[in-house]
Amino acid sequence: MSVEALLLLSFGGPEGPEQVMPFLENVTRGRGIPRERLESVAEHYLHFGGVSPINGINRDLIVAIEAELARRGMQMPVYFGNRNWEPYVEDTVAAMRDNGIRRAAVFSTSAWGGYSGCAQYQEDIARGRAAAGPEAPELVKLRQYFDHPLLIEMFADAIRDAAATLPEDLRAQARLVFTAHSIPVRAANRCGPDLYERQVAHTSALVAAAAGYPEYDQVWQSRSGPPQVPWLEPDVGDHLEVLAARGVNAVIVCPVGFVADHIEVVWDLDNELAEQAAEAGIALARASTPNAQPRFAKLVVDLIDELRLGLPPQRVGGGLVPGYGSSVNGALCTPDCSG
């Protein structure tokens, strides 16, 4: 299938203090989140000057993708659109239409299936095309890539690099802990069932094996919403308490659920969890995310080549866990994943 452009589609984030509350209102629209809760979350962004790292990382990734496209002799413009902040996907798709783009691949900055990881991006695609009108380009979302060999390799290398920052006498006994964003149990059960959890668990197992860790833990982080609504557990903070009670004195935390340093990584892990670990006497090392590594750009262009050349998907682990291929103009990733 021929494509003329790439749209990098992401979550979005504020880029100044005055943008924080409007951004959070966009994220939570229709969910009835109290103003007090939004103001509390806003403090996380304001700690970093009101700037989320995600937009800057995505712009750097686009530069890396453009370099990889050029290296392969592929002439293809790369566009950038977001769900919750500028540049909004609606504006970006309109610009693609005005530039004469007829068909483009879409890479979303989530490796996973499920509603928030995949189907919500399909909604973004459909909304962007609807806003652009009848001349909107055809948009083909690239497949889920949770088991792509380069993703596994990047996280495995990041774990080894994180381990090297621990005191030498603690490295061999450090406990490896994988984290991913928690979601409501009800939402998890609607997509698969347990599709998201199985994909995360599969990726964690592949990364642990590649990094040389036969034992590890899989936990969740960054839950929100009413306490009476069950979310995926255990929480990373609660698990750290369990490890401290067992006498564990060194932990490597790998945010395998994130392909970039979202605020949930740089605040929830690098600040809150780090403070908790220090109080418990645990040496904590956090593995980096792919961010804008050249290897991540290569992964993106690999996915484009799979689409345009009809190549078989590169998957580690024999495809034992469901992964869904490309879809067109906002089709659902899997029939059960309706929201």
UniProtKB/Swiss-Prot annotation:
Gene Ontology process terms (BP): heme biosynthetic process
The protein's Enzyme Commission number: 4.99.1.9
Pathway(s) annotated for this protein in UniProt: Porphyrin-containing compound metabolism; protoheme biosynthesis
Annotated localization: Cytoplasm
Catalytic function, reaction form: Fe-coproporphyrin III + 2 H(+) = coproporphyrin III + Fe(2+)
Keywords: Cytoplasm, Heme biosynthesis, Iron, Lyase, Metal-binding, Porphyrin biosynthesis
Principal subcellular localisation of the protein: cytoplasm
Signal peptide: none
UniProt xrefs under InterPro entries: Ferrochelatase, Ferrochelatase_AS, Ferrochelatase_C, Ferrochelatase_N
Protein residues bound to Fe-coproporphyrin III: S52, Y121
GO cellular component term, pick one: cytoplasm
Residues given in the record as Fe(2+) binding sites: H181, E264
Molecular-function GO term, any one: metal ion binding
Top-level EC class as recorded in UniProt: lyase
One Pfam family matching this protein: Ferrochelatase
Domain of life, per lineage: Bacteria
Known function: Involved in coproporphyrin-dependent heme b biosynthesis. Catalyzes the insertion of ferrous iron into coproporphyrin III to form Fe-coproporphyrin III.
Family: Belongs to the ferrochelatase family.
Record HAMAP family: Ferrochelatase
Protein's name according to its UniProt entry: Coproporphyrin III ferrochelatase
Source species: Mycolicibacterium vanbaalenii (strain DSM 7251 / JCM 13017 / BCRC 16820 / KCTC 9966 / NRRL B-24157 / PYR-1)
Top-level taxonomy: Bacteria, Bacillati, Actinomycetota, Actinomycetes, Mycobacteriales
